[in-house]
Amino acid sequence: MIKWPWKTNDAGRNMALPWDEALAIPVLANLQPDEQSKLVQLADRFLQQKRLVPLQGFELDPLKNARIALLFCLPVLELGIEWLDGFHEVLIYPAPFVVDDEWQDDFGLVHNQRVVQSGQSWQQGPIILNWLDIQDSFDASGFNLIIHEVAHKLDTRNGDRASGVPLIPLREVAGWEHDLHAAMDNIQDEIDLVGESAASIDAYAATDPAECFAVLSEYFFSAPELFAPRFPALWQRFCQFYQQDPLLRLRQNEDPAGNSSHQLH
């Protein structure tokens, strides 16, 4: 059990939550004890600042609250909780939900259709999630709905809309865009060769730069062994932006014989 040094001084109202149990999921398994402690502090502040709203009969409990907060704060572990400013509510459906989607075709005609969504993120509005996909985000598989939507929020801090380029120094923007588009082209080439379902990276990453940043952020934190060797230049840019190196964590967690619960490819 982790010793939480601030428990005795009543630093947060959520310290009674089952943090040790909440941390016991594969996507968080490689965090060092000091990182776990820092993440819990951020998650406590997150739950004080944000309102989790269950919808359509879904029920929250202390463990669900804790795990949701931990995943929200993982991308900002080194950036700081203020990077999650700009929204106050997280709406949670029990399963993927149906929304009305409006879009304009090449001829200027506006179409409206009902589509199934896993999650949504609005620049000045709430983040919308569903519990089934949140549960699937606990694994170290490359899929993480919460990190995906958080990445969109981080992306929009750089302007009015998500562009795939987060708030980085201006001198680094051109290089970031070059490496991101190169990754998109590489992913699309694989899709053209083997099809979407057989692609080793989620095909959604090839749709536009904003989705590429969000999808690769999922892989950055939950499957670094797939991201880093395939796109090494972009990997380094993600490490610099997030100020974290999940692949280093993964390797440090290997046993003395060089084995790991996650096999590097």
From Swiss-Prot:
One of its GO terms (cellular component) is cytosol. Its EC number is 3.4.11.-. InterPro entries: MetalloPept_cat_dom_sf (IPR024079), MtfA_enterob (IPR057256), MtfA_fam (IPR010384), MtfA_N (IPR042252). The keyword Glycosyltransferase does not apply. GO terms for molecular function: aminopeptidase activity; metallopeptidase activity; zinc ion binding. Pfam families: Peptidase_M90. Binds 1 zinc ion per subunit. Keywords: Aminopeptidase, Cytoplasm, Hydrolase, Metal-binding, Metalloprotease, Protease, Zinc. It is found in: Cytoplasm. GO terms for biological process: proteolysis. It is an enzyme of class 3 (hydrolase). Zn(2+) binds at H111, H148, H152, E211. Its cofactor is Zn(2+). NCBIfam families: PRK15410.1 (NF011939). Belongs to the MtfA family. Involved in the modulation of the activity of the glucose-phosphotransferase system (glucose-PTS). Interacts with the transcriptional repressor Mlc, preventing its interaction with DNA and leading to the modulation of expression of genes regulated by Mlc, including ptsG, which encodes the PTS system glucose-specific EIICB component. Shows zinc-dependent metallopeptidase activity. Interacts with Mlc. This is Mlc titration factor A. It comes from Escherichia fergusonii. The lineage of its organism: Bacteria, Pseudomonadati, Pseudomonadota, Gammaproteobacteria, Enterobacterales.
